[in-house]
Amino acid sequence: MRNFLILLLLLLAAPLTKAEEVYGSELEGFKYPWPELRFYFTSQRQSVQMAYLELMPEKPNGRTAVLLHGKNFCSATWEGTLRFLQQQGYRVIAPDQIGFCKSSRPTAYQYSFHQLAHNTKALLDSLGIDKVTLVGHSTGGMLATRFALMFPNRVEQLVMVNPIGLEDWKAEGVPALSVDEWYARERNVTATMIRNYERSTYYVNEWRPEYETWVQMLAGMYRGPGGLTVAWHSALIYDMIFTQPVMYEFKNLRVPTLLLIGEKDNTAIGKDLAPPEIKSRLGNYPALARRTGAAIPGASLVLFSELGHAPQMQDPERFHRALIEGLTH
């Protein structure tokens, strides 16, 4: 009995395990693979900061790649692609957008893809960067599309990796939620929910130990002292994604465009809310990919038949080979 009590006390006194760690509302406590840099600016009458990663190449090719993360991702989740493009001679920049990860979550903020595009342009202006290869994944694909439509003279090439928003969910019949309803859902997010969703959507029902880092990155913010702030901004961002489609403007893109899409993806915002007859037709990425490729003038389409929503994480070698082959030189 005495030994049991001693063991129990030691366990209680032990530091939190990785699965139990909590992070601040701006991801304080979570370590990125490189020191994050900060861009301080004013947006919507508030002082804000945008965290970003920047890698400089040993043998520059004179080009800059900007990597835009998705809704459940951060700049750090681009780690493999950051390293790969740096090795290929690119200067590589990956920002955390306002409202995400290590960047500010302002007290009040009107989220729009237009605003996030302006913020990204301001970061590039501050760094003296003109033209970029713009790579957007998931929600970052919607943002990259908006940026390319607004600032086509700044984009040498647009690359979209399993972008969401290839269909208009509300037009397809998905019930619209209020921000308060999104918030109620986000307040209940757990690591188990995140893991189950990522397993089925990102990784085609496969799981590897390295994926857990990204589950805990997100879950740790919800568990932390600023968890309600994280949930509120997540609700605002979901509302932005749901109500601001970009697909109707694909035909207006005038930059070289490369689509890299895992066909096993089944992402559709609010799909769980839809009636069965609507739910069954949402997130059909084989069809959506081909339709999008046809809608964008001159687009190139590369399909990964066995991969899901995050091909750059599920099969980095194959993804990076397709990426470098598809980049204009």
Located regions from the model:
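N-terminal cap/lid segment of alpha/beta-hydrolase-fold proteins
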Residues: 25-55
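Conserved HGGG/HGGXW glycine-rich cap/lid loop of the alpha/beta-hydrolase fold
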Residues: 44, 48-102, 322
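Glycine-rich "HGGG/HGxG" loop immediately N-terminal to the catalytic nucleophile
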Residues: 76, 97-113, 169
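Conserved acidic catalytic loop of the alpha/beta-hydrolase fold
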Residues: 114-132
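Flexible "cap/lid" loop of the alpha/beta hydrolase fold
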Residues: 145, 149, 158-189
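Conserved alpha/beta-hydrolase catalytic His-Asp/Glu region
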Residues: 189-250
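Conserved serine/cysteine hydrolase catalytic core
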Residues: 223-294
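Catalytic active-site module of serine/aspartate enzymes centered on a nucleophile-bearing elbow/loop
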Residues: 286-329
